[in-house]
Amino acid sequence: MTAPAADDRIDEIERAITKSRRYQTVAPATVRRLARAALVAARGDVPDAVKRTKRGLHEIYGAFLPPSPPNYAALLRHLDSAVDAGDDEAVRAALLRAMSVHISTRERLPHLDEFYRELFRHLPRPNTLRDLACGLNPLAAPWMGLPAETVYIASDIDARLVGFVDEALTRLNVPHRTNVADLLEDRLDEPADVTLLLKTLPCLETQQRGSGWEVIDIVNSPNIVVTFPTKSLGQRSKGMFQNYSQSFESQARERSCRIQRLEIGNELIYVIQK
């Protein structure tokens, strides 16, 4: 019997992933890229490649969310109640509750006011702000002090999460656009005054070595914010600050980029001017 073609086996892996409640709304481009690499590593063994693909999705996406998909409908109801009541404090409380669902944003919550106050001291007031691999970070818009006319452009690999972000920003009356996008597969040449890449580069490098700076080079934005975690998800430092700072600053020098470095909470921050 002739072995199935690689594309057929990748289709089979993709079908298996879409049956998983945890990963069924991840961008097909992401699933297929990981499936392709997994199939090679598994030497064509589809069941093994499915396991490897899920492992890859966990590393770049699943590890940051609860084991079951968040109840976005309930989170929106809480936000709706606060907005309808006209209670700004209740709105912020609902947003904090929602952001705590995602580990990456949850880690930032104790320092949220300081984070955006200090960050935007080093940035121009943007007409357009793009948030790549955004997670639930767009829900922090009320803390950013953006002009009312600023358009917030948010993208992520998870269609379910992106839909929630779109609904939340609509309720907050934030001008915005959202889309499902994979930074290693989709075009990144839409212009924006400021682009955020918060805790994103380590996930890119996990998938493709050298891809972090490739994305920075391609992004059509004069001001780019890149951040790194200085502790692991288990809250261990593992020399992360030194490793990330040395590597990133070396690459920045090679490109003659102007950078400013900040550290707030467990986050190493670079403001890049291209």
Swiss-Prot record:
Keyword hit for Transferase: yes
Domain of life of the organism encoding this protein: Bacteria
Residues annotated for S-adenosyl-L-methionine binding in this entry: 102-108, 133, 156, 182-183, 198, 207
Keywords, sorted A to Z: Antibiotic resistance, Methyltransferase, rRNA processing, S-adenosyl-L-methionine, Transferase
InterPro entries: rRNA_MeTrfase, rRNA_MeTrfase_GmN_bac, SAM-dependent_MTases_sf
GO molecular function, one term: rRNA methyltransferase activity
EC number: 2.1.1.179
UniProt keyword annotation of S-adenosyl-L-methionine present: yes
Induction comment: Regulates its expression by binding to its own mRNA.
EC top class named in words: transferase
Pfam families: FmrO
Known catalytic reactions: guanosine(1405) in 16S rRNA + S-adenosyl-L-methionine = N(7)-methylguanosine(1405) in 16S rRNA + S-adenosyl-L-homocysteine
GO BP terms, alphabetized: response to antibiotic
Function summary: Specifically methylates the N(7) position of guanine 1405 in 16S rRNA. Confers resistance to various aminoglycosides, including gentamicin, kanamycin and sisomicin.
Family: Belongs to the methyltransferase superfamily. Aminoglycoside resistance family.
Miscellaneous: Protects M.zionensis, which is an antibiotic-producing bacterium, against self-intoxication.
Protein name (record): 16S rRNA (guanine(1405)-N(7))-methyltransferase
High-level lineage: Bacteria, Bacillati, Actinomycetota, Actinomycetes, Micromonosporales
